[in-house]
C-alpha cells in the first residue's frame, strides 16, 4: 500500500508533548495517535509490526510446547481479594459493580486468573509440566502516563 493511502497524519516537526525520541518518531510517522492521556490508537504500520512480533512469540512458544490462553478482561473481584492484591493495589485497578451487583475488576494483570487455571487443572502430577502464555491488551489507570509507549494506561 502506498504511503499516501495510509490512515494517519505524518509531520516534519517533533510534537511538543513527546519526551522520548521513539515516541516522537512514531507520532511523526503516522504509526499512532494520542487519543487521551496514555491511550493511543495504532494505525496500520504499527499494527503490522505488532502482529509480526506476536507471530514470532507464538512460533517460539509453540516450539517449546507453550499453550496460548486468553483470560477475560473483566474478572470477579473475589480472585483479587483471595490473592490479597485487591486492597494493596491503589486506584490503578479499575473496580466496578456489574448490573447484577457482583464486584468486578478490569484486569491489569492476569496472574490471579493463571493461578486459578493451574489450581483447577493441575490437580494431578501427571499433568505437569505444562506452560501457558497469553498475548492480550490490558488497562491500568496509570496516575502519570509518560514516555510514549513505555508508561501508558492501555498496554
Predicted regions and their residues:
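TRNA-recognition modules of translation machinery and tRNA-sensing kinases, especially anticodon-binding
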Residues: 1-155
